[in-house]
Amino acid sequence: MLKMGVVLFIFLVLFPLATLQLDADQPVERYAENKQLLNTDERREIILSALRTRVCCPFGGCHELCQCCEG
């Protein structure tokens, strides 16, 4: 009787929990699908616009978020 209870518990509780897709996984998948739909010109435009928005580092402290500007 105990073995039957364990088998029922596994199939009725644990197996459905293991096969459920988590809601947290779905936005990441949608984001990846949306990125794949971009053509190469759109990707290039996004990258170039991001590179143009860099600013000079204050007080000469250069790091990856800004460019070292002399003058």
UniProtKB/Swiss-Prot annotation:
Domains (record comment): The cysteine framework is III (CC-C-C-CC). Classified in the M-1 branch, since 1 residue stands between the fourth and the fifth cysteine residues.
Subcellular localization: Secreted
InterPro entries: Conotoxin
Posttranslational modification: Contains 3 disulfide bonds.
Family per record: Belongs to the conotoxin M superfamily.
GO molecular function per UniProt: ion channel inhibitor activity; toxin activity
Principal cellular location given in the protein's record: secreted
Annotated S-S bridges: 56-68, 57-66, 62-69
Tissues expressing this chain: Expressed by the venom duct. Is mostly present the middle of the duct (part 3, 85%) and just after (part 4, 11%).
Protein name per its UniProtKB record: TxMLKM-021
Keyword Signal (UniProt): yes
Proregion positions: 25-54
Keywords: Amidation, Disulfide bond, Secreted, Signal, Toxin
Transmembrane regions listed in the UniProt entry: none
Leader sequence residues: 1-24
Source organism per UniProt: Conus textile (Cloth-of-gold cone)
Modified residues (Glutamic acid 1-amide): 70
GO terms under cellular component: extracellular region
